[in-house]
Amino acid sequence: MMEDDGQPRTLYVGNLSRDVTEVLILQLFSQIGPCKSCKMITEQPDSRRVNSSVGFSVLQHTSNDPYCFVEFYEHRDAAAALAAMNGRKILGKEVKVNWATTPSSQKKDTSNHFHVFVGDLSPEITTEDIKSAFAPFGKISDARVVKDMATGKSKGYGFVSFYNKLDAENAIVHMGGQWLGGRQIRTNWATRKPPAPKSTQETNTKQLRFEDVVNQSSPKNCTVYCGGIASGLTDQLMRQTFSPFGQIMEIRVFPEKGYSFVRFSTHESAAHAIVSVNGTTIEGHVVKCYWGKESPDMTKNFQQVDYSQWGQWSQVYGNPQQYGQYMANGWQVPPYGVYGQPWNQQGFGVDQSPSAAWMGGFGAQPPQGQAPPPVIPPPNQAGYGMASFPTQ
């Protein structure tokens, strides 16, 4: 039972006492909002079928206790009832309340659909916001803003899937650079990638935490050092790798030394980049990321910087997010592809195109401690072609 806008209005209520009646349920739930109906089920469920009398799946019901479906007139009332009644005791039993599911509401297979990456999202933008923004371009099969699983906050990007390729192409062309909330968004194709094998060096390093990294340098520092790329280091490669984490102000690469500096518009974007990119494989090399040098003028020109004082590493951060993490939709996806592109929780990577060259420069954090060991590239990752942050 869905409204025209697709928002659910029906709740599953389980673990009921056999003394509970439809009248009692309606009396209790109607205190929260007007109820349209209540259907009590007392028969033993078959876990593989749909109850034909109500049209809802009983897959979520695994006991022999009675259960029921309560339908509201308004989605907001159903949502309020879910929050208020789940875990409450009715006639001595703690009831379980959840959204009722129908066969049509089960997760759709969108692997053959056309997926659009949407970046630079404002923190307040929700899944419904991007779905509404892209709806004029055609029928959408899925849309979601990617969230941090620990904090529940938006990671600043999302994905929209279309049934039709032409609709997706038009959305990319016409929505790129448009304002959504307080920011201009970026759009591009999103692509699925095979999982990359772990290297020994990656397996033996430690994963960083955003809360730790963001506090390791002052809020004014927006510069990331990325080193360890012995070959293939280019401005385009760094832009592809780091652009999903926020607006990039400047990039400076030093191919002969195997490192680069990337300056973001915000401290938080830089911290997310360090956490996510550090320890990943780029161009066949496991990279190290940490904060660039703090100076009174964070936009100091590169030509004024003496890089000879930074021939040592200040610290070695640990490993990236685990490769091949199993996701709920059955895909095994690494957080990064061979060329360092991030992967979202649905297994999509980001195909980023190079943008215009950036001007200016910035300093780097003076390393402390021992000089870095010589870079020894891991074995080539054969079989992989060139690669192209509590979703809602």
From Swiss-Prot:
Which tissues is it found in, per the record?
Expressed both in primordial germ cells (PGCs) and in neighboring somatic cells.
- Originating organism: Mus musculus (Mouse)
PTM N6-acetyllysine: list the residues. 139
Give compartment(s). Nucleus; Cytoplasm; Cytoplasm, Stress granule; Cytolytic granule
Q: Where is this region: Disordered?
A: 363-392
One BP annotation, GO: germ cell development
The protein's PTM annotation reads: Phosphorylated by MAPK14 following DNA damage, releasing TIAR from GADD45A mRNA.
Q: Which UniProt keywords apply?
A: Acetylation, Apoptosis, Cytoplasm, Lysosome, Nucleus, Phosphoprotein, Repeat, RNA-binding
Q: Where is the composition biased (Pro residues)?
A: 369-380
Q: What is the official name of this protein in its record?
A: Nucleolysin TIAR
> Can you quote the domain comment?
The RRM 2 domain is required for the binding to target RNA, and the RRM 1 and RRM 3 domains seem to contribute to the affinity of the interaction with RNA. The RRM2 domain and the C-terminal residues 290-339 contribute to nuclear localization.
Which PANTHER family would you find in this protein's record?
EUKARYOTIC TRANSLATION INITIATION FACTOR 3 SUBUNIT G
